[in-house]
Amino acid sequence: MNRIVLIGNGFDLAHGLKTSYKNFIDWYWKDWGEKLLHGLNKTETDGLCSFKIKDNVEVLNWASVFQGWYYRRENPLIPWNVNDVIHLVKENKDLCDYWISPFLQQICKSIETKKWVDIENEYYDLLSKCALKGNTETTVEVLNQQLHTLQEKLVQYLSLVNKTDTKICESIWDKIYSPINPKEISVEKFFQLKEYIDWCMKQDNSYWASKMQRYKEEFDSDYVDNYKKNCHKIYYVNYPRPFMLPDHIMLLSFNYTKTVHLYHNQNFFLNYIHGELNKPQNIIFGYGDEIDENYQALKNLNDNGCLCNLKTIKYLETDNYRNALAFMDSAPYQVCIMGHSCGNSDRTLLNTLFEHKNCLSIKPYYYIKEDGTDNYLDIIQNISRNFTDMKLMRDRVVNKSYCEPLISM
């Protein structure tokens, strides 16, 4: 039996990294503040928004606006706060014409109202409106260019975050490399557990010693021998540790950062399914929901621009997806979810993982909020959207009594 560990953004957040899209957008505006403070043109733009000094304002460029030619301060030696710069410029309609694209505006609106945003979902929603519903605010070509710009900015931001020193959380390591609890296996797949235990009983101690070596643990042959002699007397939950440790583990990271490397035992697999920061040409950033009814309509438009940011197509640029699929096909596996929201932007891949014939169970590790509540139900609701068979979902998802927080408060 194997294990696939889904590593999402919450995994980085649990290590103190500011990797949420909200963190990214906050940095984006601060970066704009720096640009305007030192801008050598009267119009500054990046395709997502623009700041154009009005013709009747007699300044040379944006830098001069903040060097005393427009804004005068009692103490000009005090550095400008970049957040103040952006706020002043956006609000001062006498100074400049400020334009923001519908895409960026929707992202910022989501952050303002919900305190979070999924940029990939916002892209897909606007793409559907633009291509299918006659929304004339933008075009598919312009929207794709704006997503590309955001991707470049995101890589730039995360590359800065990636320099942060992070440390292993021992409790997370223990969860990744823990035995599979038989009670977590779905009822439908329990026969496979019995077949697996029957197979285990036939293996000699040299096999188990080799397996434990991969986990860098000592092998207690007496415990296994004793179990084999008395197994007919022992309740099934007491299987020996070597039996229930996964034979192989794949850390399937949806992040671009290096944090997951801290937990990579060289005897197992690490798969950056969406690429990594040191290979920006392989970064996958787009939408991955082929189950949604709008997807078929987009495909039928015969416009490649509607499909160029489809994750399924992007997966063909590397071996990462094929390696994940080969791992799924190789043996029964448990899915453990660590920091992945299981949202619709990865729906196609998650559906393949969750409904695969070899999937034994799906165990989410949840997050405890400051008020003491947790997001277990939020994760389960998102998981349910990745299933087409709800009976299968109810059987495979591990109930909360056997789940636990990713990290304790």
Task: Label every model-predicted segment.
Residues 15, 21, 28, 277, ...:
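Solvent-exposed, flexible loop/coil residues
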Residues 2, 9, 236-237, 245, ...:
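Sparse, context-dependent recognition of short Cys/His-centered cofactor- or disulfide-binding micro-motifs
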Residues 1-15, 21-24, 39-49, 323-409:
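SIR2/sirtuin-family catalytic core signature
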Residues 315-318, 343-344:
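Conserved phosphate-coordination/catalytic loops
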Residues 41-316:
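Extended, H/D-rich, highly charged conserved domains that either
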